[in-house]
UniProtKB/Swiss-Prot annotation:
Regions that span the bilayer: none
Catalytic activity, EC: 4.2.1.24
Keyword Phosphoprotein: no
Protein family per UniProt: Belongs to the ALAD family.
GO MF annotation: an example: zinc ion binding
Classification lineage: Eukaryota, Fungi, Dikarya, Ascomycota, Taphrinomycotina
Gene: hem2
Species for this entry: Schizosaccharomyces pombe (strain 972 / ATCC 24843) (Fission yeast)
Protein name in the entry: Delta-aminolevulinic acid dehydratase
Catalytic activity: 2 5-aminolevulinate = porphobilinogen + 2 H2O + H(+)
Length: 329
């Protein structure tokens, strides 16, 4: 039976090296950013029940925790503060000198000067109402005051030594305000902004909110995080942040939004594109692997391939410790 020569594909991926050549750039250790939770208790190592192998770490234990990972090739981390007390209307502990993030930035920069430190910037972990910004009396978001406060926190993180500011609050105009604050502080030449541009009001955030003690006390975040089916709004949010001077763009969550990730890589093709494999994605994969549904390593690596194929340069994932091991070989 005659065969159309152009239909013969198997030979092109008939051995492992050829299969590598057929793919896009694979995930590397440099592509990984590890999200870590910093406790207000300096000596803490508190297990997070909903997130296997993840802990809230006190600043005094960061050397014990991060040292082995840095030796394995960890290049960057992103910090999330966790507090139980001293929450207030404006989230004053977010950038307090005695707060977990400021202390952790200084300690990590001292212990591991080669490690790139990013700070998530949001107020939900620190406000008494659990929302990501400041509120009017009727409980709605005061965008202008929120942006002012987010820029203030960002500036203080930069002064403490953070090299990357990552606002996740979803306020309109915050990238421009942060960039202006960095110019004012004469830090705009060495502190970059990777914005959570396309952050969706996702159910996959559940385990994180428990881990960071940052769930809203009333209502939800659907008026400032993007609707899950809103491709057009995501496009506008990405383009807005590019215009406002973002140095990188992030899509969050990861796996359910690969189409948005691919779109971001085209809309902002001259910027680094990040995606966040969030706590719910992490928990689902762990639970399925524990139940014998699939093999953990193979499935995690497949999700990494999906992110890179869709256009990511940076992947935030709680699987970073395992990936540092797997990518060694």
């Amino acid at each position: 039976m005659p065969v159309d020569i152009s239909s013969l594909l198997h030979a092109g991926y008939s051995n492992p090296l050829l299969r590598e050549w057929q793919g896009v750039r694979p995930i590397t250790k440099s592509s990984l950013m590890y999200p870590i939770f910093i406790s207000e208790i300096d000596d803490a190592k508190e297990a997070i029940d909903s997130m296997p192998n993840q802990f809230r770490w006190g600043v005094n234990r960061l050397e014990e925790f991060l040292g082995p990972l840095v030796k394995k090739g960890l290049r960057s981390v992103i910090l999330f503060g966790v507090i139980e007390s001293k929450k207030d209307y404006c989230g004053s502990m977010a950038d307090s000198e005695n707060g977990p993030v400021i202390k952790a930035v200084k300690e990590i920069r001292h212990l591991f000067p080669e490690l790139v430190v990013a700070c998530d910037v949001c107020l939900c972990e620190y406000t008494d109402h659990g929302h990501c910004g400041l509120l009017y009396e009727d409980g709605t978001i005061n965008n202008a005051k929120s942006v002012e406060r987010i820029a203030e926190v960002s500036g203080n993180y930069a002064l403490a030594g953070a090299q990357i500011i990552s606002p996740s609050d979803c306020m309109d105009g915050r990238v421009k305000a942060i960039k202006q604050k960095l110019v004012e502080l004469e830090l705009s030449h060495k502190v970059c902004v990777i914005s959570y541009s396309a952050k969706f009001a996702s159910g996959f955030f559940g385990p994180f909110r428990a881990a960071a003690n940052g769930a809203p006390k009333f209502g939800d975040r659907s008026c400032y995080q993007l609707p899950c089916n809103a491709r057009g709004l995501a496009k506008r949010a990405i383009l807005r942040d590019v215009r406002e001077g973002a140095d990188g763009i992030m899509v969050k969550p990861g796996t359910p939004y690969l189409d948005i990730l691919a779109m971001a890589s085209k809309l902002a093709d001259d910027l680094p594109i990040a995606t966040y494999q969030v706590s719910g994605e992490f928990a689902i994969i762990h639970a399925a692997a524990a139940a014998g549904v699939f093999e953990l390593k193979r499935h995690v690596m497949e999700t990494m391939d999906g992110f890179m194929r869709a256009g990511a340069n940076i992947v935030l994932t709680y699987f970073t410790p395992e990936l540092l091991e797997w990518l060694e070989y």
